[in-house]
Each structure stands twice: as C-alpha cells, then as structure tokens.
Amino acid sequence: MAGNTFGQLFTVTTFGESHGAGLGCIIDGCPPGLELSEADIQFDLDRRKPGTSRHVTQRRETDQVEILSGVFKGKTTGTPIALLIRNTDQRSKDYGNIAQSFRPGHADYTYWHKYGTRDYRGGGRSSARETAARVAAGAVAKKWLKEKFGTEITAYVTQVGEKEIRFEGCEHISQNPFFAANHSQIAELENYMDSVRKSLDSVGAKLHIEAANVPVGLGEPVFDRLDAEIAYAMMGINAVKGVEIGAGFDSVTQRGSEHGDELTPQGFLSNHSGGILGGISTGQDICVNIAIKPTSSIATPRRSIDINGNPIELATHGRHDPCVGLRAAPIAEAMLALVLIDHALRHRAQNADVAVDTPDIARSDK
C-alpha cells in the first residue's frame, strides 16, 4: 500500500511534488468547533519556507496556504479539511543533467527501481518540499492541542556539522536563521555556514524537540507505544537518520540508580525517560532528539551511474540547502503534534471514563 497517509483517527494524506503545480494535504478526523483560519497555519509555513536567509535554498516560494474545505464560519466542521499550497518558483531546467542518472545520497536510484519511473525535477515526491504540507497539517494539530491541554511544542537546532550550540534560552530561536536557542554563537555559525557553502559541500544537524503540558496516559501499548510512534514520525522526515527519546543513547552509560526517574508527591526528580514510560506519556515534557544527514545535493563532482549502469561523474546544480537541518524545526514540531493529537483522540475514544485516585504528579512539579 502507498505510504502517503499518517495517523489513525487524525489522518493526514499529503500530495504533490517539488516542481508540480502545488502540494497539500487532506486532514480527516479533526474535531469540529476548532477556530481555524489560514493565518493560524501560515505562521508555521513562514517559519519553514525557503529563501529566508543565505544559509538555505534560494528558491523563493511564498507558501501561501488555501483552506479549500472543512471550515465554515471560521470553525472546523468535523469533515475533511483540504489544504493547498501552490508552487510558484520552480526552475526545472536545473535538473536536466540528472534525468538519466542518479544523484548519490538521494532517492533517485530507489524510486527508479521501485516505480520504474520518477519525477527527477527537484526530487519530485521525495523532495523535502513535501514537508510543507505536513507543517500545514501540524499547525492545525498544534492549535487543537494547545486549546485542549495547553500543550506547547518547541524545536531548536543544537548542532550544525561539528559546531555544538549551547542552550541560552528559547526566546532566541526566532531571532536567528539557525533556529538556535542561542545568541552568543550566531556570528560563529554564520561564518561556519559561509565556509561550508563556499566549499561546495554540506553538513548535517541535530535538533531537540520538546512538548510541554502533555496529558498523562497517551500511547497504545504494545505496538503503538507513544515513543515508537514518535520515532516512526521523526524517521519519516526527509534526511533524518537517528532519533533519541529522553536520555537516548546516553542511557547506555547511566546506571539504573541514575536513569530511573524517581517519583515524589511533589513530582518526578528527573526526566531521563523523555516523558514516556512503557510507551505511555507520564505528563512530563516529552523530549526528542533527531539527527539529520548532510544535504545530498552538492556541487562537488561525485561518482555515480546512469540508468543503463554506466559509470559517470555527477555534480548537482540548482538551489539547495547547505544544511537541510536548518529548516527542520517546524517540520519536527509538526510531526510530534500529529502523533500527539492522534493519540489524544485514540485515548479519548477508549479511556475517557478512566479515573484513578493517584495524583498526576507531573502537574505538581510545573
């Protein structure tokens, strides 16, 4: 089955290609009565869109969203919500040299073997341009989660290439082109990215994503554990090569006496679990880290083959991100929001009447 739909109760089906007429999504299962306007969605799209600094692709897209259905008199109706984003700045001539060849590190080779055809213009369906539709859907999910639970989802870049970025405060994230929670290192990062671009190469990135004010109880053991679904969602983002929940791989070097989050009447004493135990949310902040590989489209010539298997040397021309991770924060936020709203609706469907006497201690440590 084609893998274009995400979620079980809050489902999102995306469509479109990088150089097609446009892209978008159909959201089904959104609860009725949510106040929703195009401006609610546009905010996150503007954070993701290309051409916002010299450190990202210079493709100029306004990414203006249109709500085609599912909203009446400013509120969702409970029927499918159709969102459309038109492409306006395609430059397909940049990709003529790869029509009969495969770019190293890209999906060209695998799409060709799977489908027997491919849209080589900007990567077609495999392009990160598709994530604009996910960000649009995620904006709807984020608004519902915030109104229902007060949930706030924040992502920021913690490393670019070999440059680790110190955390100085979330107020800095929107003030620089790196989505960095930092002020003092921005000039250093600017110079570093300029050098990467001039070298005709690219670098990867690491991001941290947090969700605060998540209710306790979300997650469906054993196969639809909340952490498993978050990892699935994050790995579905283009170029993501690694996911950590909570302490992640650092758990290997921790002792059990340190890693296990102790409980007190006043709250948890730590959050090595990343807000999830047994696949179910604890009510603490959900903490996720993702690793993003270097952009595969670079102007440095590399070895490859053509569709007949002949050896070639290929350099990728066009407008590309020297670090695709710099625009990934809104995408990661959106995917986490889509997981949380889907599980919130699933929990409500089965367990809305469940009540226990034990206090929600994660709320008491806020």
Swiss-Prot record:
List the pathway annotation: Metabolic intermediate biosynthesis; chorismate biosynthesis; chorismate from D-erythrose 4-phosphate and phosphoenolpyruvate: step 7/7
State the EC number(s).
4.2.3.5
Provide the alphabetized UniProt keywords: Amino-acid biosynthesis, Aromatic amino acid biosynthesis, FAD, Flavoprotein, FMN, Lyase, NADP
Provide the cofactor list for this protein: FMNH2
The UniProt entry, under CDD domains, shows: Chorismate_synthase (cd07304)
Q: Which residues bind FMN?
A: 125-127, 238-239, 278, 293-297, 319
Q: Does the keyword Lyase apply?
A: yes
In terms of InterPro entries, this protein maps to: Chorismate_synth, Chorismate_synth_AroC_sf, Chorismate_synthase_CS
The free-text note explaining how the cofactor binds reads: Reduced FMN (FMNH(2)).
The UniProt GO MF terms for this protein read: chorismate synthase activity; FMN binding
List cellular component terms (GO): cytosol
Q: Which EC class, in a word?
A: lyase
Under PROSITE patterns, the record lists: CHORISMATE_SYNTHASE_1, CHORISMATE_SYNTHASE_2, CHORISMATE_SYNTHASE_3
Q: Which residues bind NADP(+)?
A: 48, 54
Reaction catalysed by this chain?
Answer: 5-O-(1-carboxyvinyl)-3-phosphoshikimate = chorismate + phosphate
Its BP terms in the Gene Ontology are: amino acid biosynthetic process; aromatic amino acid family biosynthetic process; chorismate biosynthetic process
Q: Which HAMAP family does this chain map to?
A: Chorismate_synth (MF_00300)
Q: Can you state the subunit structure given in the record?
A: Homotetramer.
Family matches, as NCBIfam families: aroC (TIGR00033), PRK05382.1 (NF003793)
Q: What does this protein do?
A: This reaction introduces a second double bond into the aromatic ring system.
Similarity section: Belongs to the chorismate synthase family.
**Would you tell me the protein name for this molecule?**
Chorismate synthase
Query: What organism does the record attribute this protein to?
Result: Neisseria meningitidis serogroup C / serotype 2a (strain ATCC 700532 / DSM 15464 / FAM18)
Tell me the gene name.
Answer: aroC
